[in-house]
Amino acid sequence: MLGSYIFTDPKGELYDDTAGYLKSHGYDIKVLNLVNPVNSDGYNPLAHINSELDVDVIANTVVKGQKSEGGSSDPYWDDMAEMLLKALIYYLIAVRPPEEQNLASCAEMVRAASNNGGGNILSEMIGQLPYDHPARMYYKSV
């Protein structure tokens, strides 16, 4: 039986070097491209959230996976991006129907906030949740 594997491949080099070999050995290859979703297979990691740890892993993987190899960045900004993503995920799970609980909806919320002068819209939306809701706790840290 073949196992399942997930690789972070920001430049696509691992895919280019190994996809043919893996396919020839019976593996089903899927590509999750968050930068260019048109060139991506469908997968919704938010559909599989069962715990706070799942939210942590998804947010960490998305933020850390977008750094280019050898690129430097200030850990502060990575931490802020991760906390914002966690807040958005928790908000979507609490408020939106299952078909809208996805990373595209997270990106849509950030775009809407950017187009309307910053985080006021996000603050209003998340502020409607109970005070101790995880979305509020992560958002107030951003």
Feature roles, as predicted:
Residues 77, 82, 86-142:
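Non-catalytic, charge-rich alpha-helical accessory subdomains
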Residues 1-91:
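Switch/coupling segment of Walker-type NTPase motor domains
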